[in-house]
Amino acid sequence: MNPPVEANIRKTALNATHRQSGAKMVDYSGWDMPVEYPSVGGLMKEHLAVRAGVGLFDVSHMGDIRVHGPEALKAVQYLTMNDASKLNTGQAQYSAMLYPNGTFVDDVIVHKFADDDYLLVINAGTREKDVNWVKDNTRQFKVTVEDLSDQFTQIAIQGPKGVDTLQKLTDVDLSKVKFYWFTRGTVAGLKNVLIARTGYTAEDGFEIYIPSDAATSDRVWNELLQAGKEFGVVPAGLGSRNTLRLEGKLPLYGHEISDEINVWEAGLDRFLKMDKGDFIGRAALEKAKNDGVKRALVGLETIERGIPRDGYKVLDLEGKEIGYVTSGSYMPFLKRNLALAYVPVEQSALDNIVAVEIRNQPVKAKVVPSQFYKRPKKSS
């Protein structure tokens, strides 16, 4: 039984639907959100359903910032580390906003609507901070910044059967929408819906943006559940979203990335375009690279009994603290106890043995490749 929602906690338009479905609700970054659905078997079943079939996630707590105007591209280029000039209209890009010292304000997905119109999708826990950051750092550009966060219900349809599920409700040929591209079309009778082939589960799938009124949101959610019935669809909560993203080494703000971690340390430099011109954090990152990276994000697998959890200490074999676990869990699909952790570079080689302090006891762990899961390539 869930306690009543406190007055100051925010709710998505689907809140009543989650509660009526018996979801276990938690306070997540000030939002009353479903962590799992005991009625479908909870986190483990949800995780496995997304890997094999399809799961539905309410991700309406995420933020949406529109940057538009004659200097929109210049503004986005200055705000983010990837090269938005390479985007075609209808294409999305993983990127990040950085502080002047090269650490993370937040990671973002940049969507290009037009040459003068972009949408930044940001994290729930950093919404207000991010909106203020964008406004404060684009004053020198001819742009308008709009916080659209409360205008949309955002539903993620994730898993290999996500495309088949959504296809039943739309006139858009989804097979023509490539990964990290988006389009607009009719979904469940709603016109002009943003349909993006994106997600946070290391699986194929889509995210749709619909009007944020409760009646519309509830209807579309239930129609998606009905459409996915033959594929074993389940409603899924933040618990399985976390284990799914962890299997795929997708970073989470406050864990793998934060205002104390720079891009080199996080291993996200493949999204860093130093040659595109000036952007916030560029000079500091150049210096950090020349100075040499001192720590690295690695994968760990315990080789003794114990599950590494977020925040646990990483020790060397003499018992000295050398780092910490950013995210860790038993992985339902892989059936392994795995974690991501920051350790000194000299301790980061594959197969190196360290220890994780679990319940005040050192438990041996091996450094393993950090992308634990890669989705299978589709056969032609």
UniProtKB/Swiss-Prot annotation:
One of its GO terms (cellular component) is glycine cleavage complex. The glycine cleavage system catalyzes the degradation of glycine. This is Aminomethyltransferase. Its EC number is 2.1.2.10. It holds the Pfam family GCV_T_C. It is an enzyme of class 2 (transferase). GO terms for biological process: glycine decarboxylation via glycine cleavage system. The glycine cleavage system is composed of four proteins: P, T, L and H. Transmembrane segments: none annotated.
